[in-house]
Amino acid sequence: MLPRIEALREIIWRFDNHSCVVSPLGYITRDLFSITAELRERCFYCMGSMGSVIPLALGISLARPQVHVLAIEGDGSLLMNLGALVTLRRYNTGQISLFVFDNRCYESTGCQPSQPDGFNIEDICGAMGLQTYVAKEPRHIEEFFKMRKASSEPTGVLVIKVALAPPSARVDEAPREIASRFSKWLCETSRTH
């Protein structure tokens, strides 16, 4: 299992000029916010909503096909909108990389179990027809990115097994400010590419 913040760093340092990230509510976004000060214009932190990452990532990729969207989702948040996986399978043109952080619980609200015994998020993603891979070490994330770069097809989903960990500080920006800054970046990106 990887520490959550280490997994985020492994993803984020691979950003390029055509990348943005969409993240879910809770500890994932708090950690992401703490390590992306210089990239915040390209980060959409979903605060206060579960199950919205995939629909937002799809909207961005369809409206701005030149943008590579790194969609980071938690296992609990993904379970709130499993239908989004079917939509992702249907409409992903290859510009979305989905990362599911799986700690098997709703960590942000007290670690209530998110999945029954014998249930695996990667099996659900695979059943939806998505190529699904599992990461338990940093090298697995690197291998996923190499595979994505070498393929013209959508690379599917990387389920990252993450360990429980104390969160970073709360996001200290208002959702309106986050949305405005991100929208501005998207508009500028469409003019320059």
PLM features: residue spans?
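Acidic-glycine-rich active-site phosphate/pyrophosphate-binding loop
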Residues: C20-L39
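Generic C-terminal helix-cap and adjacent flexible tail
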Residues: R191-H193
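Non-catalytic terminal/interface segments that mediate subunit docking, oligomerization
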Residues: I12-D16
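N-terminal, charge-rich interaction modules
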Residues: R4, H18-C20
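Thiamine diphosphate
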Residues: L2-R9, S34-T189
